[in-house]
A protein has these predicted regions:
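Non-catalytic, mostly N-terminal accessory regions of nucleic-acid modification and defense proteins
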Residues: 1-146, 150-151, 220-229, 320-324, ...
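Gly-rich Lys/Arg/Thr-decorated short loops/hinges at beta-loop-alpha junctions or inter-strand turns
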Residues: 122-125, 251-257
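Conserved S-adenosyl-L-methionine
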Residues: 130-242, 247-251, 258, 266, ...
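Structured alpha-helical segments in the cores of large, soluble enzyme domains
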Residues: 272-280
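Short glycine-dipeptide loop
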Residues: 280-286
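Acceptor-substrate binding/catalytic loop of class I
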Residues: 294-298, 328
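Flexible, glycine-/basic-rich loop-and-beta segments that form/coincide
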Residues: 327-358
Length: 358
């Protein structure tokens, strides 16, 4: 059982297990969760929780643990600044009882736990911040199906938010290839197959948790301003999927020079297109959401990124979406671009589709 690996085999280690504390008195549950479980999760390493000594002090997981196979870096890193905000034992007991009831009757199946988490994210993230709009689930699924990811792909979302595209790609791969995947492919699936970047640490914490609930035990999500000088990744991925921020501009000084060489602009929606081309290996596919301005804008920066994609790579599809897709931002008109990085052109027949309803 995986829990035997995660929890220390001591009395204090075992006391952190849900089955051990869920039926206790509310005060005891509160003490165990706030003083043990929560601090332990923040210090999780190699997929293992740390233990506590007799004085109640946390004992960190040994770095050289012979059983450690992969460090749970993303999860512990983005839990570092998390705060325990549940105010009283009674509130926590209601949460524990509610989750136990839900688990017993509905979500013992792992996929359901992920679905529940995504449902809660929908409630949490209905408000767009800094140009982020929560991408509706059915639009994400459509985009993933257009790209048809396989277990041999390495998939990146450089504006990952809550990791919706990465989770949908993981589900697609499992649904289509679960019976034929090799152990090496499963190892990659759990760690290196999916990468995400964001500039919001809260989002990274949420996305790491979302991926872990979908069997990606050591997700590669990182704090990175994708279009800045700090991001020097190139030719690493075979698939890019994203709904990059398209309300923002970025400080000209911090923009990565090789993106400016493709499109000299401060507009994030254009810089991200140049970024996708840089992140992808030759032959890599991209499907991304862009505002209509990218298709019709008349500035030199708009023209140069369109020319780059059409003449030097292979544009395959432009799918115009209804303006109400991003409720409640009804005024935002968007499209999906699908293209392949070739470095040698190849744009011939482009599929244009006008989606009237979603």
């Amino acid at each position: 059982e995986s829990g035997d690996y995660i929890f220390p085999q001591t009395e204090s280690g075992q006391s952190m297990r849900w089955s051990k504390f869920k039926d206790k008195d509310p005060r005891d549950i509160f003490d165990i969760v706030s003083q043990r479980v929560f601090p332990a999760i923040k210090k999780m390493k190699h997929g293992k929780l740390p233990d506590f000594n007799m004085a109640g002090d946390l004992v960190e997981v040994n770095e050289a643990d012979q059983y450690s196979n992969s460090e749970n870096t993303a999860f512990s890193r983005y839990m570092e600044d998390a705060m325990f905000l549940i105010p009283t034992p009674q509130v926590l007991q209601k949460i524990v009882t509610g989750l136990e009831d839900l688990y017993t009757h509905d979500i013992a199946d792992g996929d359901m736990q992920g679905d529940l988490y995504e449902y809660m994210l929908g409630k949490l993230a209905s408000a767009g911040r800094n140009g982020q709009f929560r991408t509706p689930r059915h639009i994400i699924d459509m985009i993933v199906e257009l790209v048809e990811p396989t277990p041999d792909d390495t998939i990146c979302d450089p504006a990952c938010g809550t990791a919706g595209f990465l989770v949908a790609s993981a589900k697609y791969i499992r649904e289509h290839y679960e019976d034929t995947m090799t152990s090496d492919q499963w190892d990659a699936y759990a760690s290196t197959m999916f990468s995400g970047f964001d500039t919001d640490r809260t989002m990274l914490r949420i996305s790491a948790m979302n991926l872990m609930l979908h069997s990606i035990s050591n997700p590669d999500v990182d704090y990175k301003d994708s279009v800045s000088k700090q991001n020097d990744i190139s030719s690493k991925y075979t698939v890019c999927l994203a709904n990059p921020p398209f309300k923002g501009t970025i400080d000209a000084e911090s923009i990565n020079d090789n993106l400016k060489a493709v499109t000299n602009t401060k507009k994030t929606e254009l810089l991200f297109l140049a970024l996708f081309l840089r992140l992808l290996k030759k032959g890599g596919r991209c499907a991304c959401i862009v505002p209509d301005g990218v298709l019709f804008g008349s500035s030199n920066a708009h023209k140069s990124i369109r020319k780059e994609i059409i003449e030097n790579h292979q544009l395959q599809a432009v799918i115009s979406m209804p303006s109400g897709v991003f409720k409640p931002y009804a005024g935002v008109s968007t499209a999906v671009l699908v293209f392949t990085k070739t470095g040698a052109g190849g744009t011939e027949n482009v599929w244009f589709y006008d989606m009237k309803a979603d």
